[in-house]
From Swiss-Prot:
This is Nucleotide-binding protein AFE_3021. GTP binds at residues 62-65. It comes from the Bacteria. Pfam families: PapZ_C, RapZ-like_N. Displays ATPase and GTPase activities. InterPro entries: P-loop_NTPase, RapZ-like, RapZ-like_N, RapZ_C. One of its GO terms (molecular function) is ATP binding.
Amino acid sequence: MAERDFIIVSGLSGSGKSTVLQALEDQGYYCVDNLPATLLVDFGAQLARRDASSMLAAVSIDVRNREFLAALPQALADLRQRYALCPRILFLEADEGTLLRRFSETRRRHPLTDDLAAALGESLLTVLRREREMVQPLADVADKRLDTSQINTHQLRLRVQAWSLASRHYSGLVLLLQSFAFKKGLPLDSDFVFDLRALPNPHYDPELRALTGRDAPVRDFLEKSPEVARSFVSLRTFLQTWLAPFAQEHRNYVTVSLGCTGGQHRSVYMVEALARLLAGEGQRVLIQHRELGITETLT
C-alpha cells in the first residue's frame, strides 16, 4: 500500500526538533535539517518526481531561517497548486524553565543569541521570549502542537511515532496506552486519565515490591482482586465504546493514561492487560510505561 507523508518540523529552540527528525528518519523518512525556506518548493518538486507509491519526507526549519515565516504561506500554496503536496506542520514547544535548563545542560548557544542580542544585553530568557513571539504564527497554523516539557527523548520519539503512523499506511486510530506515577506528575498530552490508586497495592507485599506489573507474581496478586476485575471491565467497556466514535471524527490517535502511586505495579498491569485485549481485536496500540522507560508497539 502507498505511503505518502510530508512533515515540516518546527518550534522553539531546545524543544526537541533534532530528536524528532532522527525519529522520523528511523521510520523511513527522508529528512533534511534546517532547510532554507526559499528551497522548500524546490524540495517539493524533487519529491513529486519520485515514485508516487512511496514518499516519506520531513524537513526541520527554525528561527535561524528568519525569512521562513514570511515565505511560508506562499510556499505552502505553491506546493499544493503545483505538486498536490500538503505538508503537515509539527510544532514543538516547552515551558521557559525547561528550555533554560536544557540550554544550561548542553551549553549550546541559542540561535538568536547573536551580536545584536549581546549588544542589547539580552538575557537568555529574553531571547527565548523573543523567539516565542516570532514563531507564534507558525504555532497557530500547526497540524500538531507538542509540549515536550515533561517528556524525555525516548518518550518524544514514541509520540512522534504515534502521530506519523496515523496518516500513513495504517488508516485507523492509533491508541497510546501509558502508565505513570501520580507523584511524578500527570502526562501533559493525555486525552483521558484514569486513577488506579484505589486498587490493592502490591508495593506492601515485600516479595512483590521490587517487581513490576509485567511480572507474573504481580499479575497473579492483582487478578485475585474483585476490584481489579471490575476496573478492568469498566476500562475495557469505555475504550471499546469510545474508540470507534473517535476514529469517525478523523482523530489520528488517542492517548489514555493510567496512573497509580509509583507507576510500577497497578497502572503497568492494567496497561498491559488492556493492550493485549485491544490488540487482539485489531486495534493498533502503542504502550509506554513512563516510569519504567519501556515502549512497545502491538498490532
